[in-house]
Swiss-Prot record:
PROSITE patterns: ENDOU
Signal peptide (UniProt feature, chain positions): 1-17
UniProt organism field: Caenorhabditis elegans
The name this protein goes by in its record: Endoribonuclease endu-1
Keywords for this protein: Endonuclease, Glycoprotein, Hydrolase, Lyase, Manganese, Metal-binding, Nuclease, RNA-binding, Secreted, Signal
Role of this protein: Catalyzes RNA cleavage releasing a product with a 2',3'-cyclic phosphate at the 3'-end.
Family as reported in the entry's similarity comment: Belongs to the ENDOU family.
Subunit composition and interactions: Monomer.
Short name of any one Pfam family annotated for the protein: XendoU
EC numbers, comma separated: 4.6.1.-
Catalytic class of the enzyme: lyase
InterPro entries referenced in this protein's UniProt entry, alphabetically: ENDOU, EndoU-like, EndoU_C
Amino acid sequence: MCSVLIFISILTVLAQCQKIPRFDVSNSELLAMAQKLRQVDTNRARPDQIKLNYQGHTVTRDDSDAAQAKLFSKVDTSLFRKPSYELYINLMDNFNRQTGVIEPRVSQAEEKNEVGKFLDYVLESRPMQELYNWFKAKGHPIATSPQVFRFWIGQLWFSHYSRALGRPDTSGFEHVFIGEAKNGEISGMHNWVRFYVLENNRTENFDYKGFTVKRFNIMAALKFTWDGLLKRAGSILIGTSPEFDMALYTMCFLSRRGRETCDVEFDGCPLQITSFEIMQQNKVYIGSIYPTAGRITDQCRAQNRFN
């Protein structure tokens, strides 16, 4: 009973004034940890499970179309029967795309239940367990216990805050993993599974228009329209599991949010992860997180020459 009261009191203090200290970690440590997360991402797609059709290069200054076909010419949909993918896809209809509209789109009970199931699985996954143990070993306050870690992951990613009109209309998860409409354009949406689902649902009126940057089957920045609204360059990691993206992005957010990028490397290809926080009512939320391509290297080309 005493331990329960202590835990509740800790969460009460956290809820009242949320300030996450800067994390003193070197670039080499982040690089090594990112590669470790990739190694344990056993739910990511194998190279033979995804085939991309990038088609034409395009630019961000207009809405020109350099792609007549879909981006994904092949995806082994057995991937989507894995629990994290299935639970993620179940969450996709919970959100109002337009900013300024109060969330959730479904009942609060349904949202709480589906988010809870997703977090239950993700927090027990290998990438998130590795991340928790790493933070705990380094004494980060987000990982003093599994309960505190869950609180912060839920707060940073799923708690609602306002992006427009002062209404609780968004969350870090919605922005990064789902996508939003603001000021007549698409904002956020940095996940390959979401891209694939929208591209293969005719009712979404989704049109891929070409790439601005591509790094084989690892990462790309893509132009598209969604129900007539333009996204000039939306960047995604390709083939990664939902739990990997959440673990990597959480690590980078807590370590390098703001002006610094989180520099990582996958399959020989350098990438940067950019992240921003939003503070409202003394609480901290994920504002945005997205990958960008680093300089193309001979190692990147050599390791991915068959992709």
